[in-house]
Curated annotation (Swiss-Prot):
Single GO BP term: translation
GO molecular function, one term: structural constituent of ribosome
The protein's name in its UniProt record: Small ribosomal subunit protein uS10
InterPro entries named among the record's database cross-references: Ribosomal_uS10, Ribosomal_uS10_CS, Ribosomal_uS10_dom, Ribosomal_uS10_dom_sf
SMART domains found in the cross-reference section: Ribosomal_S10
Entry keywords, A to Z: Ribonucleoprotein, Ribosomal protein
Gene name linked to the record: rpsJ
Length: 102
């Protein structure tokens, strides 16, 4: 029988917030006795938006804005019921998007 694995994918706009959240998850999982692989930094997604500075004309004058999405991947190998329960109770910041796959 194959070993069970939980894959957690984190996304955030601020790299400090996502790193602290990943650290919290890793500490919680290691306390419960499961093995952790990660956090693995995935490529940062960079969206660039080009906007005309003037409200009417002057198309040559433009301004660029960028939005970076940082991503991390954490694998939990052989999770126990205690591990799953502690992950459900974990309090993480609102700026972090969490995707969990079993």
């Amino acid at each position: 029988m194959a070993a069970q694995k939980i894959r957690i994918r984190l996304k955030a706009y601020d790299h400090e917030v996502i790193d602290s959240s990943a650290r919290k998850i890793v500490e919680t999982v290691t306390r419960t006795g499961a093995q952790v692989a990660g956090p693995v930094p995935l490529p940062t997604e960079k969206n660039i938006y080009c906007v005309i500075r003037s409200p009417h004309k002057y198309k040559d004058s433009r301004e660029h804005f960028e939005m970076r999405t940082h991503k991390r991947l954490i694998d939990i190998l052989d999770p126990t019921p205690k591990t799953v329960d502690s992950l459900m109770r974990l309090d993480l910041p609102a700026g972090v998007d969490i995707e969990i796959k079993l």
